[in-house]
Regions:
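Phosphate/dinucleotide-binding and metal-coordinating scaffold of catalytic cores
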Residues: 1-187, 191-248
């Protein structure tokens, strides 16, 4: 019996269910939207609000909410596998990473990450207040490259409930992005969750290395005194912003 998963919204889960094979097929056909039947259109509509360039769907597997991310036609490297490996590496390094899973169905890779902005209650899901770094800083998409990790640190100081813990976590995430060459570290890929009293850094998400040939690498956000230069030296030079000394 194939494992079935259910697309969902903010209310009770709808009755229509899909196997992982059907999801993988839908993700492939989503690149030719006119081929989709009505039920699969509803499924992909549930995933369209998640953002990003890759086909994805919001689902429930068992009683847990997940995001399923699929191969994209024309991928030059196995991005689903690379993201899984990178996130597992981040977890091994002590970063806050949600539960992960991986399936290969009909020769299509499916990367799965458990949602941390929903709380399951039987057949419906409670929304946890979530804000991206873009929202927390009151920024606009057109000006994201003018912001820095120091600005995110400022938001943690202003709105956070566990300031020191989250400052150190943010610094480690910046180092990870430098070391794995993740240059998609824009403000939407940093999140905050409301804990009832204030805001905490959300668990890590959307960290994917990008192959690069150049010797000089840059992140989207500013790193340290040398701006967006993706070097450990630049990060360490600005460590005081994160309440870290050079000895730390």
């Amino acid at each position: 019996q194939p494992e079935r998963i259910t697309p969902w919204g903010d209310g009770p889960a709808p009755g229509e269910e899909f196997t992982l094979a059907e999801l993988a097929e839908a993700a492939e056909r989503a690149q030719h939207v006119d081929e989709l039947d009505e039920n699969l259109r509803a499924l992909l509509a549930a995933g369209s609000s998640l953002g990003g360039a890759r086909p994805k769907a919001a689902t429930k597997i068992g009683d847990k909410p997940w995001i399923a991310k699929f191969q994209k036609r024309g991928d030059s490297f196995p991005e689903c596998r690379v993201e899984l490996a990178t996130m597992r590496l981040a977890s091994e390094c002590g970063l806050d990473v949600p539960p992960l899973d991986f399936r290969c169905v009909l020769d299509r890779d499916i990367y799965l990450i458990e949602r941390f902005d929903r709380i399951p209650h039987g057949n419906w899901l409670e929304r946890r207040p979530f804000a991206s770094g873009l929202t927390m800083l009151g920024a606009h998409e057109s000006e994201v490259s003018s912001f820095s990790y120091a600005d995110l640190a400022g938001a943690i100081r202003q709105f956070g409930t566990k300031v020191l813990q989250d400052l150190h976590e943010l610094f480690r995430r910046m180092l990870l992005n430098i070391l794995v060459t993740n240059d998609d570290d824009h403000l939407r890929n940093h999140g905050f969750l409301f804990d009832g009293e204030g805001w905490r850094l959300s668990p890590l998400y959307d960290v994917v290395p990008k192959p690069q040939l150049g010797l000089e690498r840059r992140l989207v956000l500013g790193v340290g005194p040398e701006g967006r230069a993706a070097t450990i030296e630049n990060a360490l030079a600005g460590a005081a912003v994160f309440d870290l000394s050079h000895d730390d």
